[in-house]
Structures are given as C-alpha cells and as structure tokens.
Amino acid sequence: AELMRERMLALGFDEVVFDRLGNVIGTIHGKRPGKTILLDGHMDTVDVIDAAEWSHDPFGGEISDGKIYGRGASDMKGSDCAMVMATGRFAARTKKDFAGTICVSGSVHEECFEGVAPREITKRIHPDFVIVGEATSTSVKIGQRGRAEVVVETKGVSCHSSNPEKGVNAVYAMVGVIEEIRKIVPNEHPLLGKGILELTDIISAPYPGASVVPAKCRATFDRRTLVGEDEA
C-alpha cells in the first residue's frame, strides 16, 4: 500500500489517502466536471505453501521470457501496477484536460473477506463506473457472481480411537453430507455462467486428534450465487 501511494504521488495524483481498513485510494480530477470512474484491484495474495516447488522465487519478481514470475503477478499486482501507471500517464498526456474524476484503489483482504474492502472504499467515493482489474485473459467481463460462505457442522460422540464402537465419528457423518451436497447442481445464467458450490476446507475437532474419535466436524463451501438467488 505504501509503495502504491509513493508511485501515485510521483505520477501526479491529486490526492492519495488510506482509509481505516488500509485501502489506498488515489484520485485525479479532470479540469471539467463529469462522471467518476473507479479502477480497483486488491493488493493481498494467497499464501505460498511450498516455495521449494516453485520454478522461480515466489517473492523475487523475476523476469523470464518477457514474463514476471512471483506470487500475485497475475492475481493481481500486475493489474494494480497497470491501472496506476495508465491513470498517471493519461493525466500527464492530457494535462488533466478531461471531464470527470479517475480514482484508483488498492484494496485489502480480498482473498479472505471479499467485498468488505470495496464497500469501505465506496463510502469515500461514489463512482458512476467501476473497472476491476482481475485477470480475465484480456476479455471484458460484465458483472460478477455473488458470494456466500456455507458452513456445515456434524456432531458425534468422542471416545478413544482404540474403542471406536463406543463413539460416533463426526467425520464419517460429514462424508455422507458432502456426498449429498455434491448432487446439487447450481443454476446457470446467460451472462454470468454457472453458479458454484465447492468444498474449500474440512476440519475435525479435537485437532490434532491423537487417539481421539472426533466429536465435531466442520466443512466450508464456497457458494457463488447468480441473479435471482437468495438464502433459501
């Protein structure tokens, strides 16, 4: 965020601020009144699980065959850089003689709390148009599926694993639940494509369960919703 702020200021952005969540927001005002466009990209990335399995240093930003390799190069620091640079260059080339306002935001926590940071950004600015720079293989995507996190829990009876017949294994119960959930076929939308219902993590308790039959199991599903769907 600090690096983006420094680059924005160097490129002549009129103002650059941090909000209470840590989002960085840069603004360039045109000389004539007009609409506001927001270019947004998140700055966070998913974790690197095993750096030794990478062909390049995940934090090295190495350039090979004209490509930058590193965690987040595509998702989505490359777009963040492109939007900052393009906005700064456009303002310089036009000498800010354009109608409206251009805002560029670097948002936080997209990978784990998608949607929270942009809501905070739009409390400060009220864009007429928004472009999210997520990688789309250079094709324009209009709109986005919604998102819900579905958590399912099963309960059993804990006991020592040397006498499993004295308990009820919550994980085995969860297996049956997951099999039934996988039979659900999400709806489709002509513009947004297929809805998604995907298992993303499963954990038992106690964990680690050294010699203990688990009494609880929790599974989390990533549900990408379509227009017209609700909690039901």
What are these regions (language model features)?
Residues A1, I142, V151-A232:
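Metal-dependent amide/peptide-bond hydrolase catalytic core
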Residues A1-I49, K216-T220:
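N-terminal helical capping/dimerization or prosegment-like subdomains
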Residues V16, G26, G61-I63, L199-I202:
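A structural signal for short hydrophobic beta-strand segments in well-ordered beta-sheet cores
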Residues F18-D19, C112-F113, G133, T200-S204:
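Short gly/ser/thr-rich secondary-structure transition/capping motifs
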Residues I25, D40, A99, C103, ...:
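Beta-strand secondary-structure signal
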Residues G34-C103:
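Active-site metal-coordination/substrate-binding segment of hydrolases
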Residues I37-L39, I131, V157:
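Residue-level marker for buried hydrophobic side chains located in beta-strands
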Residues M76-R145, E149:
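Acidic/histidine-rich catalytic neighborhood of metal-dependent amide-processing enzymes
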